């Protein structure tokens, strides 16, 4: 046999080409993980650390049977408390709590996947999670490999017990670890907005929290001892100035939904409408197994969800705030628009909005709603009825905490 000898330079070039090809392959694999705001369910708002294999299986079943999966809800995310209080003493790996998950997590995740859903886990950038379980600090690459080996599709990464840590560096390290693990995993930065993640997180993850935690009240701040949580409208007030940072694959996250957790039906509608207008991730946080027909009708309103999931990916903007009625506009594909009129007060308010007298311009994206030269048809997305055109004013009464949400089409 005659052996052919190749110059060392040729071999080096071949190896370099192979390496670059492999890197490009993985880079392509991790692109476009969240072209629209992620939709799913998270365990924390209702269950905190009281989670189990039985709960996960039950939620997965209801996500399908209730129509939520069909409406676009994809991710089932286990929040804090899924792991044991100590890592494996030999390997250093995280260990699923054997009481909550006696069969481990892999069978549970496989079951979620069998339902056509995706699975998410939680951890923290600090030494411990917010509930005192093992954090990821110093274990980023090991934990990322562990998540990938289980088939995890989504990671929520919190910010407790992080004294002395630089936020950008910590989240960048975890982002690199997830990419190196060889599996596409949506990365949710739960940094509470403390270090302005909207300024640096676009190349790091697909969504980032803009505020502290939400709580199930419509407005104001609720104290929980040494920390506090924000009502729906309090969080909304913090979002308008951040819209330029949102877009496909990089979303502002005003926190999970509290629909079905004690808000009134009107407040549920307003909450869901505003999250849709904000192009916010729609992550439900109620007990899906026990939700009322009213809650289900809000969470699965496909017309409202379509506003949130519009492929243009533009976060809406607050147009006006008059007499307790906030007006929000959101540009959509095909030169269509969505508008929300939200009554923030505890008394009914009269709305009189004359399209011919208003100048609706989105300066950030150079878009305008010209109702003088173009007639738009109006559809009420909650009553699911056509309600006229922009040739005539909108005159109606908006009940306390309720919303009028319209889609404008030519």
Where in the sequence are the language-model features?
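Glycan-recognition surfaces
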Residues: 186-287
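C-terminal beta-strand-rich structural cap/linker in extracellular carbohydrate-active enzymes
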Residues: 388-410
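N-terminal module-boundary/linker segments of secreted carbohydrate-active enzymes
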Residues: 28-53, 57, 62
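Carbohydrate-binding surface patches
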Residues: 275-278, 283-285, 321-365
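Structural recognition of the beta-strand scaffold that forms the well-ordered cores
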Residues: 33, 37-43, 72-79, 118-123, ...
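Bacterial Sec-dependent N-terminal signal peptides
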Residues: 1-29
